[in-house]
Amino acid sequence: MNLQAVSCSFGFLSSPLGVTPRTSFRRFVIRAKTEPSEKSVEIMRKFSEQYARRSGTYFCVDKGVTSVVIKGLAEHKDSYGAPLCPCRHYDDKAAEVGQGFWNCPCVPMRERKECHCMLFLTPDNDFAGKDQTITSDEIKETTANM
């Protein structure tokens, strides 16, 4: 887990007396940036390969896209117990996991082969590659500097 410290200053522009106080308050915010476990990444990698074969879809020609999505799914699997789509914004991720609509493969993918994340692409998609496989090393290499 990587931690980032961010400093924020809070000063007052004016006071009721018209005098600007010389004090300001500093607050530090710590943000945790988690990395998914290798086990979850491997589980999601294997799932993605199997689902691509089963659904007749292909990974993006840019394996970086595939890698980022797989890691996002793995991170959500670690955090919430289910591979919630990492390409959408949620007000309440835990509630979304419970509903199941956006758990991968999501309902639009299962019903219409529409993957918002571009993980599973139909052969006629301009961004579809020829591969239905990706190695653990490819995932590590393409996401190393993120």
Swiss-Prot record:
InterPro entries: FTR_bsu, FTR_bsu_sf. Its EC number is 1.8.7.2. The gene is FTRC. Catalytic subunit of the ferredoxin-thioredoxin reductase (FTR), which catalyzes the two-electron reduction of thioredoxins by the electrons provided by reduced ferredoxin. GO terms for molecular function: 4 iron, 4 sulfur cluster binding; electron transfer activity; ferredoxin-thioredoxin reductase activity; metal ion binding; oxidoreductase activity, acting on iron-sulfur proteins as donors. Its main location: plastid. [4Fe-4S] cluster binds at C85, C104, C106, C115. One of its GO terms (cellular component) is chloroplast. Its cofactor is [4Fe-4S] cluster. It comes from the Eukaryota. This is Ferredoxin-thioredoxin reductase catalytic chain, chloroplastic. It is found in: Plastid, Chloroplast.
